[in-house]
């Protein structure tokens, strides 16, 4: 007979190892598993471990040519999710050798590549990953990081201010550059290409880059502050993307931008390497993230996408606002923020952080709050995000009744007032509105902005809760 036992396997025998002690070099994953009716959680959990590592559905004789014990993923713990029927958190440990060094693409292909279509599962969500230093050290990470960015821009002790130029599509390059100049001249640090501004018939990329660079230098000369505009280098091919980044560097601008999920991790990592080699900051937009992370029981939580971005490389990334028009629950969002900025993050289930995450010397990423925010949100944003963040007001700048420069000035005054109040020991959470009101007495621009947006509320319940 053959030298192995043919037939369909019971995954549980090989891949369920509750006695396993995880190694410091293992990549650990926490999956939220919803098994099909009648499938026991151990069976579902081990199926995940197997299919995302060495397993296949039947015994193959080539198994005998390798050491499964060395390479298999192990399901080492299963716990029911409180308050949910038939949902379990399944913990899987993957040996480091399963992954190519320095490749977020390969990491995701392995861990989430196949297993989400598995018949035994009704739904599956990757909640968190623990990236060991042995693996994170194989990545360059963010091109520059928070401290280097502050030194490049010469801006300290406060959040940075941005504005997405609207209408996002349809402006000519010259009119677009005019809006950029007005916002920067009015007091913002950055303006931003919208994520879907690439190179369309009404505004080709090269024209936009030129007019924006002109706007930037003019505003810089007039204000004596360093200014930036996130020039979106996202393109249809990697070669074209790099070509745009090269042109940005030749113009001498400080920062470019990329849509990392639609562009892909391979392209993003290439761009991040180029940016470090050439002194460009890299702003990352997370377009398409909600397709992946919004459903509570299926997909990938954004905290995993945020960790992946820190490895792949980016200096800023959108992380939700807590207060604006888009999804973001406070504790969960703060979980993203600390994972992006800090060197060492303790396990904290109240923020959805399933594992203690050491980043050792990987630079940090500035979280960007953007989407439906205006001057009345400034105290809350300053309080929640702290100094190391970028606050982006698109409509909250360009929607000012007196135009763009006053809109920018209103935001800058509101921010400076909040930072000053905080530094003097005031509690922004409680006294924030008073701080804004007081500041608006000596700033007509702010006073007008306060009037326009005083009643606007964009409140809905968050979909993704703990």
Swiss-Prot record:
Keyword Plastid applies: yes
Annotated site residues (Transition state stabilizer) in this chain: 325
Modified positions (N6,N6,N6-trimethyllysine) in chain numbering: 5
Post-translational modification remark: The disulfide bond which can form in the large chain dimeric partners within the hexadecamer appears to be associated with oxidative stress and protein turnover.
Keywords: Calvin cycle, Carbon dioxide fixation, Chloroplast, Disulfide bond, Lyase, Magnesium, Metal-binding, Methylation, Monooxygenase, Oxidoreductase, Photorespiration, Photosynthesis, Plastid
Principal subcellular localisation of the protein: plastid
Record localization: Plastid, Chloroplast
InterPro entries per record: RuBisCO, RuBisCo_large_chain_AS, RuBisCO_lsu_C, RuBisCO_lsu_C_sf, RuBisCO_lsu_fd_N, RuBisCO_lsu_N_sf, RuBisCO_lsuI
In-chain residues carrying the UniProt-annotated modification N6-carboxylysine: 192
Keyword Transit peptide set for record: no
Catalytic activity: 2 (2R)-3-phosphoglycerate + 2 H(+) = D-ribulose 1,5-bisphosphate + CO2 + H2O; D-ribulose 1,5-bisphosphate + O2 = 2-phosphoglycolate + (2R)-3-phosphoglycerate + 2 H(+)
One cellular component term from this protein's GO annotations in UniProt: chloroplast
Domain of life: Eukaryota
GO molecular function, one term: ribulose-bisphosphate carboxylase activity
Binding site for Mg(2+): 192, 194-195
Gene3D superfamilies per record: Ribulose bisphosphate carboxylase, large subunit, C-terminal domain, RuBisCO large subunit, N-terminal domain
Similarity-based family: Belongs to the RuBisCO large chain family. Type I subfamily.
Subunit and partners: Heterohexadecamer of 8 large chains and 8 small chains; disulfide-linked. The disulfide link is formed within the large subunit homodimers.
PANTHER family per record: RIBULOSE BISPHOSPHATE CARBOXYLASE, RIBULOSE BISPHOSPHATE CARBOXYLASE LARGE CHAIN
Protein name (record): Ribulose bisphosphate carboxylase large chain
Gene: rbcL
């Amino acid at each position: 007979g053959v030298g192995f036992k043919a037939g369909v396997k019971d995954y549980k025998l090989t891949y369920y190892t509750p006695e396993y002690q995880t190694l410091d070099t293992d990549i650990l994953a926490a999956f939220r598993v919803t098994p099909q009716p009648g499938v026991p959680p151990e069976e579902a959990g081990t199926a995940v471990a197997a299919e995302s590592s060495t397993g296949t559905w039947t015994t193959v004789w080539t198994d005998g040519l390798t050491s499964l014990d060395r390479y298999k993923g192990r399901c080492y713990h299963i716990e029911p999710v409180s308050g949910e029927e038939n949902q379990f958190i399944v913990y899987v440990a993957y040996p480091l050798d399963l992954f190519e060094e320095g490749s977020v693409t390969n990491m995701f292909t392995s861990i989430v590549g196949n297993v989400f279509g598995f018949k035994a599962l009704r739904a599956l969500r990757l909640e968190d990953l623990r990236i060991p230093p042995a693996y994170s050290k194989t990545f360059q990470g963010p091109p520059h990081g928070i401290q280097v960015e502050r030194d490049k821009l010469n801006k300290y002790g406060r959040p940075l201010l941005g504005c997405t130029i609207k209408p996002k599509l349809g402006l000519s390059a010259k009119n677009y550059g005019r809006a950029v100049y007005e916002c920067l001249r009015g007091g913002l640090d950055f303006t931003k290409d919208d994520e879907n501004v690439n190179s369309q018939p009404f505004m080709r990329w090269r024209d936009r880059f030129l007019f924006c660079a002109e706007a930037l230098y003019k505003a810089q000369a007039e204000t004596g502050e360093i200014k930036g505009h996130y020039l979106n280098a996202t393109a249809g091919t990697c070669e074209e993307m790099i070509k745009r980044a090269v042109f940005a560097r030749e113009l001498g601008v400080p920062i470019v931008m990329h849509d990392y999920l639609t562009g892909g991790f391979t392209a993003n990592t290439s761009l991040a390497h180029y940016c470090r080699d050439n002194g460009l900051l890299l702003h990352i937009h997370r377009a398409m993230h909600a397709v992946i992370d919004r459903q509570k029981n299926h997909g990938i939580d954004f905290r995993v996408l945020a960790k992946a971005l820190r490895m792949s490389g980016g200096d800023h990334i959108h992380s939700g606002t807590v207060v604006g028009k888009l999804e973001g629950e406070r504790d969960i969002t703060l979980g993203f923020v600390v994972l992006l900025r800090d060197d060492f993050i303790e396990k904290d289930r109240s923020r959805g952080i399933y594992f203690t995450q050491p980043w050792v010397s990987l630079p940090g990423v500035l979280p960007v709050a953007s989407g439906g925010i205006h001057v009345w949100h400034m105290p809350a944003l300053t309080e929640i995000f702290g100094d190391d963040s970028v606050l982006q007001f698109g409509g909250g700048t360009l929607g000012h009744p007196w135009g763009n420069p006053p809109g920018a000035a209103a935001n800058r005054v509101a921010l400076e007032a909040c930072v000053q109040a905080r530094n003097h020991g005031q509690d922004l959470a409680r006294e924030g509105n008073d701080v804004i009101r007081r500041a608006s007495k000596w700033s007509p621009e702010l006073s007008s902005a306060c009037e326009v947006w005083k009643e606007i509320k964009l409140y809905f319940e968050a979909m993704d809760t703990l």
